Amino acid sequence: MTTIVSVRREGKVVVAGDGQASQGDMIAKGNVKKVRRLYNDSVLVGFAGSTADAFILFDLCERKLEMHQGNLTKAAVELAKEWRSDRALRRLEAMLIVADKTTSLIISGTGDLINADNDLLTIGSGGYFARSAATALLENTDLDAREIATKALTIAGDIDVYTNHNHTVEELNA
């Protein structure tokens, strides 16, 4: 798996992820870019799960964003509906965090759309570790969104064997 973190703070939104790809109990690659920009660089997307499946979902997400002129909520609803109802897509094993200037969501293959709680979202095998660390940092420090996401990923990477310390961090002004 992996760890993806999204943090919103002080007019910034950050989506960050580690770079480890695993095959069973073996590390296949250590520098996979699991966080990308879509729709004219206005939407950040991070994935956890199967890399091949995630690329299919990135493409589908881009098409839904274009169809809805960049309206992330509408695009996410349509993506979740199609992902859940299409026989081939239903078999995809991945989760997405998507964020733009105003909205952060988790999209899952079961059709779930989850809004950010306390300006924080995490997915992947190290998600609970990263969430705990980021929550503590949000509540007890003045660190910015980028620093919180990076520190949370580092802590998750120290604990979770499926998360490494090779981070990709993308940021938008919110």
Swiss-Prot record:
Primary role: Protease subunit of a proteasome-like degradation complex believed to be a general protein degrading machinery.
Membrane is among the record's keywords: no
EC id: 3.4.25.2
Keywords: Allosteric enzyme, Cytoplasm, Hydrolase, Metal-binding, Protease, Sodium, Stress response, Threonine protease
Entry protein name: ATP-dependent protease subunit HslV
GO biological process: proteolysis involved in protein catabolic process
Organism this protein belongs to: Aliivibrio fischeri (strain MJ11) (Vibrio fischeri)
HAMAP family xref list: HslV (MF_00248)
